[in-house]
């Protein structure tokens, strides 16, 4: 890869989106303009408590989707009803920062989300009060990196976009400018 390579979405953010947000919210300081800090992709595998091989498929899928080795998440407490013991692997997560984060967001917005059948847009009510956005995907087949013939079972995932926005409105404006397909008030995609 060339040394002066900049991801497409990152250069669009720097050239177009930052000035738009500064005029829209009338920020006096450029450091007040919201930006994306990191993207966390989490895949919980509850069936791993019964079959320990299930976690390997989740690790392989997350590695293919994000291009980064996932961190294995283990149970903190034993729960008898779920036949779960403390320390058993129950999920995997990847934290993306920098250029990998921008490349993942670009692939997610331009390739993966449009491939979802009957996709009507993301809900814009899933902000946490501080400008961070979390949404869930029901299966991993929408990513081109996953070979549909080789998956053993569909696995969902949670994706959290952490921003430097102070309010939900700033975070919503940032993600809308980046190209997140939010639903409107009437339920239609904007």
Swiss-Prot record:
This is one of the proteins that bind and probably mediate the attachment of the 5S RNA into the large ribosomal subunit, where it forms part of the central protuberance. In the 70S ribosome it contacts protein S13 of the 30S subunit (bridge B1b), connecting the 2 subunits; this bridge is implicated in subunit movement. Contacts the P site tRNA; the 5S rRNA and some of its associated proteins might help stabilize positioning of ribosome-bound tRNAs. GO terms for cellular component: ribonucleoprotein complex; ribosome. Keywords: Ribonucleoprotein, Ribosomal protein, RNA-binding, rRNA-binding, tRNA-binding. It comes from the Bacteria. This is Large ribosomal subunit protein uL5. Disulfide bonds: none annotated. GO terms for biological process: translation. Belongs to the universal ribosomal protein uL5 family. HAMAP family: Ribosomal_uL5_B (MF_01333_B). Pfam families: Ribosomal_L5 (PF00281), Ribosomal_L5_C (PF00673).
